[in-house]
């Protein structure tokens, strides 16, 4: 007789909301959102982002979570249960976290390394030119920190939905919010006089960040802002990678799904806005507008220099910052690993503990290759969008720029045109709950979201340039 492995479920809506928000709040909120906001006219970008979050983001999030709860299955199985002919979409969605996990954990290792540097009082060393490059091009250190980070991620997943994911989300997410609010307030109090006698303050930086700047905005410029906001939102809310389908499958039928989805949206957007409020004023104060950059350059090069400029307080603020980033990264990587583990439990009937061990070994082996991509296995490859890439960048491009928009596009076609939106509406309104923005959802999933996702795909291939 085949042994049945229990899947587990969230005990209530709070655990689900915090776990899902933890997944959505990741490195992208912290190292990409502030840069784009500063680049794209501050409040102009934020305004476009919020409108898209309430329409486009809401549609994709609702679709993923409702599919998960309706089927009670992981992505590998769920899409086939919605329609027998769409098993392939489940396979495609399940490949995304398999690609993401190893390189995300490699970056997570970088974060832990910097946390340890600031914890041990060596933050000034991290601010030196070439420190970050010297670290990632090293042979053993990145691999060791990858292993530590992967162990922490696997530990949470190994403990299961209730004792692991839900419990740790309830602890980490409130702490993350408190830390990010604290650093944001501190950033606004900063003042600095540069070598030319120019005084810059955190409040001036906040103005650059929040006040819409329509000066010189053309239709083409607005389109750039729109596509930037669209891409950032899409990658921020953890859709189209099987995560929200997996988390949705753990939600009890009596839970008010629409209320939970609204709370996830709000939490993710607030953290993204606070990340900007934390970073833009601080970077502006000490480095001016030209100090803003995106990605690893912002977090591992610019910000350590900012912390150094703060004097004695910099070491403490740097430690708190990298602790907060560690929490944000781990809650995200836990959800990525859980998406893969849930597929193994549902499809292959392997126990959670065995599945977690198998996935951890896989992520470690591929993660080592990613780490070596900056030294022994270094190469440069030109991507379709014009960027130059190494192993990590190639994996990021495949998952974020190709697979995720494709999975989301096919999901919209499946729900909007094949099985019809009523399937999702029935699941959301189960138990007599209201579906707010129902008409908006139907229009978005059938018409607008597919067009926007097609535009993202075209941009990834370098066909649509902004």
Question: Residue locations for each model-derived region?
Answer:
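Inter-helical loop and helix-membrane interface segments of multi-pass membrane transporters/permeases
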Residues: 4-7, 36-40, 73-92, 105-164, ...
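Transmembrane helix-boundary motif of multi-pass solute transporters/channels
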Residues: 12-50, 243, 259-262, 266-269
């Amino acid at each position: 007789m085949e042994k049945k492995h229990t899947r587990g479920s969230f005990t209530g809506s709070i655990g689900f909301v915090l776990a899902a928000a933890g997944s959505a709040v990741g490195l992208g909120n912290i190292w990409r959102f502030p840069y784009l906001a500063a680049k794209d006219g501050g409040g102009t970008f934020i305004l476009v982002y919020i409108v898209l979050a309430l329409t486009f983001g809401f549609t994709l999030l609702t679709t993923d979570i409702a599919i998960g709860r309706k089927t009670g299955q992981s992505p590998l199985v769920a899409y086939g249960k919605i329609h027998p002919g769409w098993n392939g979409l489940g396979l495609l969605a399940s490949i995304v976290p398999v690609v993401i996990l190893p390189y995300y954990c490699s970056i997570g290792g970088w974060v832990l390394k910097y946390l340890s540097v600031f914890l041990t009082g060596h933050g000034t060393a991290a601010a030196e030119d070439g420190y970050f490059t010297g670290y990632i091009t090293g042979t053993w250190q990145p691999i060791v920190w990858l292993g530590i980070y992967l162990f922490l991620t696997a530990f949470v997943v190994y403990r299961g939905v209730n004792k692991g994911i839900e419990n740790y989300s309830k602890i980490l997410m409130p702490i993350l919010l408190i830390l990010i609010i604290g650093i944001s307030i501190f950033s606004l109090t900063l003042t600095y006089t540069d070598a030319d006698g120019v005084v810059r303050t955190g409040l001036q930086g906040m103005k650059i960040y929040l006040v819409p700047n329509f000066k010189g905005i053309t239709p083409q410029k607005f389109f750039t802002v729109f596509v930037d906001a669209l891409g950032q939102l899409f990658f921020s809310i953890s859709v189209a990678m099987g995560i929200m389908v997996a988390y949705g499958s753990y939600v009890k039928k009596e839970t008010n799904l629409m209320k939970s989805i609204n709370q996830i949206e709000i939490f993710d957007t607030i953290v993204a806005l606070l990340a900007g409020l934390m970073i833009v004023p601080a970077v502006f104060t000490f480095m001016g507008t030209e100090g803003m950059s995106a990605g690893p350059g912002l977090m591992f090069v610019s910000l350590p220099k900012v912390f150094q400029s703060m004097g004695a307080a910099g070491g403490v603020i740097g430690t708190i910052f990298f602790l907060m980033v560690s929490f944000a990264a781990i809650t995200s990587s836990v959800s990525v690993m859980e998406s893969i583990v849930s597929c193994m439990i549902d499809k292959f009937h392997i126990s959670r503990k065995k599945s977690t061990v198998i996935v951890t070994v896989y992520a470690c082996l591929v993660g080592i290759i990613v780490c070596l991509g900056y030294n022994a296995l270094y190469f440069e490859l030109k991507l379709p969008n014009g960027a130059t890439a190494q192993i990590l960048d190639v994996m990021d491009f495949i998952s974020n720029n190709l697979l995720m928009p494709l999975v989301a596009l096919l999901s919209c076609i499946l729900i909007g045109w094949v099985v019809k939106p009523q399937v999702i509406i029935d699941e959301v309104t189960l138990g007599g709950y209201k579906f707010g923005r129902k008409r908006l959802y139907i229009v978005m999933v059938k018409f607008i979201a597919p067009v926007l996702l097609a535009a993202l795909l075209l941009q990834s291939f370098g066909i649509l340039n902004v």
